[in-house]
Amino acid sequence: MRGISRRMVLLVLGVPAVGVVAAGLAYFAWNREPAFYRAALETEAATLAHGSNELLEQASALVTDIRRQGEWRSLFTANQINGWLACDLPKNHASLLPPGLEQPRVALEKGRILVACRRAVGPMATVMAIEVEPYLLQPNELAVRICSARAGWIPLPLEPILQQIAHATTEAELPLRWDQAGGDPVAVITLEPRRDDQRVLSVESLEIQAGELYVAGTTRTGDWPSADPGPDSAPKPPVLEARLPEDDGPAAR
């Protein structure tokens, strides 16, 4: 009886204690912010405004270059993108953000993009973070590998993100197919050549380095090859490598 009573006391005291610890760990994991996101939110307003203006100027110059025949290229920095996200997006393009999401920021690392934003869930708020690896399979064929999605440190299902990608490509009338790499879903999006006064746009290079995103291509005149030249003449997309993303630890995600 004494042993049973002691066991019951331990259970009565231990179960609530374990529950409190588990709840505390869950709360800590739910509210954990990626290091890059905390740093981005601490950027001074003047720096953000300057970055936003730089991005808008470079984007305008890129559009002008694309409209001319010949090669074009541009380089955008994470500071410029975050400046635009902080200043111009909420002011002039707030409808682009899904309801409940705010303060988006990005980090550019070699070969990958980290995106994070705040999301209110009832009385609580968390930081959602997504890691993607975008690259070109061939000119005008963009692959986006969705590596992970988290709320704090807690992994989230990828299905809602895949549905958002499918919806966005449908709205933009861009062909989409799905592939896999290392168990991760890969969205393969065909960027249809734009025809404007006989000019055709070809996106030929996309590189992501630490803090920088580089894009380049060519604008040509004349006819573009048929969209379906046949299985023999169509270029074959390379086989996707089953490569796992580099692991920088939970704080980097």
Language-model-derived ranges and their functions:
Residues 2-253:
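Extracellular/lumenal and peripheral-membrane lipid-interaction modules
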